[in-house]
Amino acid sequence: MSEVLEAPARPALANFIGGEWRPSVSGRTYEKHGPWRPSEVIGELPASDEEDVNAAVAAALAAFPEWAGLPAAKRGAILNKAADIVETRAEQIAQDMTLEMGKPIRESRAEALRMSQVFRFYSGEGLRPTGERFEQMLTGSVAYTVHRPLGVVGLITPWNFPAAIPAWKVAPALVYGNTVVMKLAQEAPLTGLHLAACLEEAGLPAGVLNIVIGRGSEVGTPLVEHPDVKAISFTGSVPVGRGVREEATRLGKRVQLELGGHNPVVVMADADLARAVELVYAGAFWSAGQKCTATRRIYVEERVYDEFRTRLLERMESGVVGDRTTRPRRSGRS
């Protein structure tokens, strides 16, 4: 069974800074090629650099006082409306996701809806009480804590989950009153541009969310180093994450990292081998293994090693390799 995916309607292939869709300051661009066919050019995108980062941070800094002063419930309401918009555009978002990074359309559709779910969940945080109250020894005295936004935060996202991970980072940052500069992965920026367009339509004020597209060394590094960026959240490889941590902590910024994993499976002799094979297969080949939770090692009890190995190889041989037009159940294998 095949399904030909048409080119979806999409936002401008541009940076999103101060509520405007902009080319890079330098005017430089790069070609985004399809993962299935390297000769397939999806579009031209801005090859941004430090000047674009500076413009985005300036826009976020200018928008921060008014956004932080807005009641949290109103910030949450914008996220809730954005969730509605994402749901109406889920198919467009899913098609662009598969087009740009190769995930089977079934997985992309689920992830597009996940973006909506994340927005919906964090919209509720705008109504949740925060802070604590502490009784004191002195009569008439009370101590309490309140939560305050940090200011401008920098978010750096990977290409393998281009809807879910940006949503996980953006939604909490916004509902708690921060403004955002986000660097999307150069390999998969289209999905994140949909995220920005949905928030813009939901009424997010200009400058609250800014997106800059480009290489890590030309966009990520100046974002981490910018003096007006108070915190960094990075998802990516261990070597790059270590560099982000060292530089951010040296500059006194808050930093959060989600780095690559190396995940094992243990198969005991009394395991249901048929189920174990399916779980290992799914863990290794969902999204072609391009995720931090993918199965990379298998430890099998010696008594069942030969049987398990034979079954797993048979399962791998039964997989179907397909491109985005053939709707494989798994990326690379199905």
Annotate each language-model stretch with its function.
Residues 1-44, 77, 131-156, 256-259:
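Terminal low-complexity tails and localization/encapsulation signals of metabolic enzymes
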Residues 38-129, 140:
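Glycine-rich loop-to-alpha-helix module at the N-terminal edge of alpha/beta enzyme cores
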Residues 131-275:
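Rossmann-like NAD(P) dinucleotide-binding subdomain of oxidoreductase/dehydrogenase enzymes
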Residues 42-48, 63-69, 155, 265-268, ...:
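Short, well-ordered beta-strand elements within core beta-sheets of diverse protein domains
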Residues 19, 39, 75, 97, ...:
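Residue-level signal for inorganic ion chemistry
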Residues 64, 68, 83-90, 94, ...:
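Structural signal for hydrophobic packing residues in well-ordered secondary-structure cores
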